[in-house]
């Protein structure tokens, strides 16, 4: 089963938030941190998701896995590094 992946990447002078497989941005922000916060919100809402944040060079600088415990509703976040 594929886990949805929400990605933050640079687009001109803004940061766009998209989901893997989409060719358009769901939202755009002037600040990277605002885009990451929005992406994290999408990940929590979808219950099981990955958030990837790219840096200015297009390299993944942040990767987090969000999972929701179905019994308690607690959201767990695991940061991954390459």
Language-model-derived ranges and their functions:
Residues 27-30, 72-74:
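A short, polar/proline- and glycine-enriched secondary-structure boundary/capping micro-motif
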Residues 2-4, 59-82:
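A cross-kingdom feature marking charged/low-complexity
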Residues 2-26:
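Short aromatic-glycine-(Arg/Gly/Cys) micro-motifs in beta-strand/loop hairpins
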Residues 24-27, 59-61:
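Short, surface-exposed beta-strand/loop "edge" segments at domain boundaries and coil↔beta transitions
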Residues 9-11, 53, 78-80:
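Compositionally biased, intrinsically disordered low-complexity segments
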Residues 20, 54, 65:
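Surface loops and adjacent helix of pleckstrin homology
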Residues 48-61:
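Charge-dense, low-complexity polyampholytic segments
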Residues 29-50:
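A short, charged, amphipathic alpha-helix used as a generic interaction element across diverse proteins
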